[in-house]
């Protein structure tokens, strides 16, 4: 059935949702008003790969292919379905974070400045470009309003392709431990990661960027819930306290902020639902990646595996919808968009490398502080560049959120000093 007829059916079932914030109003027939419909179509495209793949995995396992299989396909099936048991001689232990005796305090300070600058520049640029791409028009003139880029899935694909290339080159050029995880297990983290990224980009059509940043900061709560369900973790009292403070701060910001121009209760609700979807999918991704690290792979190998399936899912879904060519044509019509999308992908991939290097050199606590400050700077930068307003109560709510995040870092450090096992920091393998 033609996509326009599907649009008519869904419009009859759901109220029309206009683009929120400062974005131009979309025409009635535009699918940007039907985010739920696009989500279902995308998910169906991913299922067309996941379901046959799952059935094949179950078939090979029931057939005991590891014992009976032979031929040219055996190594491929073994790697994808069963994995490889790492041998002691094959393991390449990742170097622990140690401070060399000859390293001077000045050199350490310069390295910290390099890491902090790299993270801030990468992710602040990424945030500014993300808001520009999803909320502004391209090709606008005095007589024409231009056109907006609306396909969030195409943007996810561009990010993942460059990240896959960077991870692949890192695996080839740098010595890695022998890979032991079955490849199919990456597909679950990849699916949730693609869906979380899609929700993140799509939400910017309905809510402001500062609201999105605070929503990301509040994902500590669903991460803890997912940790209980997926990893059976237990948490300290201070973690529940800081999670409550974050909830209070976010509530202060959301309840005190006035509506953006052209927004409505329907668009705001759509944005909040998409942000909730982002947080839920991202929380699952983090906990699934933590479980996968039991196979002793490196962070770069994890990055490669997740992005490989992300590219497979998004390319397949875009081809099924006929949207891959349209996204490419949009890039051809608007060179500015092509430059923005490329720079967005570069910032994402470089940010990943800075994450790995910073944690390796200074630990997760320093990394968390840098990224917390980055979120605060991102809100300030967005308000300056795109004219978002924040009330006094909203500003206090933002302060409460970031104070709670820094309190979590301090509490983790105290636990480490006392020799207690601190709750691991959220997996940083895929941030965007």
From Swiss-Prot:
GO terms for biological process: 3'-phosphoadenosine 5'-phosphosulfate transport; 5'-adenylyl sulfate transmembrane transport; chondroitin sulfate proteoglycan biosynthetic process; positive regulation of canonical NF-kappaB signal transduction; transmembrane transport. One of its GO terms (molecular function) is antiporter activity. The chain crosses the membrane at residues 5-25, 40-60, 109-129, 154-174, 238-258, 265-285, 299-319, 353-373, 387-407. One of its GO terms (cellular component) is trans-Golgi network. Highly expressed in the placenta, pancreas, mammary gland and skeletal muscle. Weakly or not expressed in colon, heart and prostate. Expressed in the brain, predominantly in frontal lobe gray matter, subcortical frontal white matter and cerebellum. It catalyses: 3'-phosphoadenylyl sulfate(in) + adenosine 3',5'-bisphosphate(out) = 3'-phosphoadenylyl sulfate(out) + adenosine 3',5'-bisphosphate(in). It comes from the Eukaryota. It is a multi-pass membrane protein. The keyword Phosphoprotein applies. Probably functions as a 3'-phosphoadenylyl sulfate:adenosine 3',5'-bisphosphate antiporter at the Golgi membranes. Mediates the transport from the cytosol into the lumen of the Golgi of 3'-phosphoadenylyl sulfate/adenosine 3'-phospho 5'-phosphosulfate (PAPS), a universal sulfuryl donor for sulfation events that take place in that compartment. This is Adenosine 3'-phospho 5'-phosphosulfate transporter 1. It comes from Homo sapiens. The gene is SLC35B2.
């Amino acid at each position: 059935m033609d996509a326009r007829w599907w649009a008519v059916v869904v419009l009859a079932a759901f109220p029309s949702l206009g683009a929120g914030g400062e974005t131009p109003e979309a025409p009635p027939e535009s699918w940007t008003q039907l985010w739920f419909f696009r989500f279902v179509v995308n998910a169906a495209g991913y299922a067309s790969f996941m379901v046959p793949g799952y059935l094949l995995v179950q078939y090979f396992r029931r057939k005991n292919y590891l014992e009976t299989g032979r031929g040219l396909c055996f190594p491929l099936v073994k790697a994808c379905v069963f994995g490889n048991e790492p041998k002691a001689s094959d393991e390449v232990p990742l170097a622990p974070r140690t401070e060399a005796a000859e390293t001077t305090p000045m050199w350490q300070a310069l390295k910290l400045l390099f890491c902090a600058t790299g993270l801030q520049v990468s992710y602040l640029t990424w945030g500014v470009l993300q808001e520009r791409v999803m909320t502004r028009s391209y090709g606008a003139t005095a007589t024409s309003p231009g056109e907006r880029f609306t396909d969030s899935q195409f943007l996810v694909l561009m990010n993942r392709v460059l990240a896959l290339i960077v991870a692949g080159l890192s695996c080839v050029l740098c010595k890695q431990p022998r890979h032991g995880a079955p490849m199919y297990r990456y597909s679950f983290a990849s699916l949730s990661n693609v869906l979380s990224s899609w929700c993140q980009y799509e939400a910017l059509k309905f809510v402001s960027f500062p609201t999105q940043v605070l929503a990301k900061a509040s994902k500590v709560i669903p991460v803890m819930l997912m940790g209980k369900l997926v990893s059976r973790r237990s948490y300290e009292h201070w973690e529940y306290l800081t999670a409550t403070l974050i909830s209070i701060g976010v509530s202060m910001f959301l309840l005190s902020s006035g509506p953006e121009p052209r927004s409505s209760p329907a668009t705001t609700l759509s944005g909040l639902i998409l942000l909730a979807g982002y947080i839920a999918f991202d929380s699952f991704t983090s906990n699934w990646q933590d479980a996968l690290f039991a196979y002793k792979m490196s962070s770069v190998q994890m990055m490669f595996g997740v992005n490989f399936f992300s590219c497979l899912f998004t390319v397949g879904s875009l081809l099924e919808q006929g949207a891959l060519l349209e996204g490419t044509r949009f890039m051809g019509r608007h060179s500015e968009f092509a430059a923005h999308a490329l720079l967005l992908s570069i910032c994402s991939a470089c940010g990943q490398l800075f994450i790995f290097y910073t944690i390796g050199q200074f630990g997760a606590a320093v990394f968390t502080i840098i990224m917390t400050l980055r979120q605060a700077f991102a809100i300030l930068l967005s308000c300056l560049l795109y004219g978002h307003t924040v009330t006094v109560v909203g500003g206090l709510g933002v302060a409460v959120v970031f104070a709670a995040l820094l309190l979590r870092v301090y509490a983790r450090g105290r636990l480490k000093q006392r020799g207690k096992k601190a709750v691991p920091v959220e997996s940083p393998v895929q941030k965007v």
